Design a protein with these regions (language model features):
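Catalytic cores of carbohydrate-active enzymes across secretory and cytosolic contexts
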Residues: 1-229
């Protein structure tokens, strides 16, 4: 039986986790949620926790101090976050942080491959894990992979403030479906993509670029207002 497998940078806890669990449990099909547990440890062997919850399985693991410093605080927080929040003047990038970013995405993929089954549908959440599908596919994974941007997609001028922007765009093409919250965001992405690689529009809303075929979709994100107050 196929599952929905959600891979996210960091898992929530407490009330948020319970709420998310109820949402997953309401689905007819089982699921798997994989991500960083929020802990940072300085041990060579870092345990991977596997738990069964109502309606889905949960796989979590800690980061090393170096992973947290270079990936989370470095490339993501000091680099990608300012660009994706329209504050490029605050962005700081180094080759070492980018290397850690790619390496940690490979680690996410390594752990995911140990738990994925044929037919599982993989959904990856946001820009901390942009290259994750590439790491999965390069290990031979054949499962369908989707990626969702919950933030506005940056303009080409903003994106070019990232030294590795071309590599990041190329890594997105390993996804079978790329989701956005608005049509404007999708159009901005396609405009940025066409500036880097030739595009070919195929039947059934498929797109071909840099040797990959993928689709895009619009999935407006919202909240349950009753849970706010």
């Amino acid at each position: 039986m196929s599952r929905l497998v959600l891979i996210s940078n960091k898992q929530c806890d407490g009330k948020d986790l319970a709420c998310a669990g109820r949402t997953l449990a309401a689905d007819a099909e089982p699921g798997l949620w994989l991500g960083w547990n929020g802990d940072v440890q300085n041990f060579a062997q870092r345990p991977i926790s596997c738990r069964q919850r109502a309606g889905y399985d949960q796989v979590t693991f800690p980061l090393s101090i170096e992973e947290f410093r270079r990936h989370y605080q470095g490339y993501y927080h000091d680099g990608l976050w300012p660009v994706f929040h329209n504050q490029p003047e605050k962005a700081h990038f180094t080759p070492e942080n980018y290397r850690a970013y790619r390496q940690l995405n490979c680690r996410f993929a390594d752990i995911a491959c140990e738990h994925l089954c044929p037919g599982d549908i993989v959904c990856i959440d946001d820009y901390q894990l942009l290259p994750c599908a590439q790491a999965l596919k390069e290990q031979g994974l054949l499962n369908a992979c989707a990626f969702f941007f919950h933030l506005p997609f940056p303009s080409a001028a903003l994106l070019r403030r990232i030294p590795e922007h071309r590599q990041l765009i190329a890594s997105l093409l390993f996804y079978d479906l790329i989701g956005f919250t608005t049509t404007d965001d999708r159009n901005t992405f396609l405009s940025c993509l066409s500036g880097e690689f030739p595009l070919e529009m195929l039947p059934d809303d498929q797109i071909q670029a840099n040797g990959h075929i993928f689709a895009t979709g619009i999935f407006p994100a919202g909240i349950n207002a009753r849970q706010v107050y």
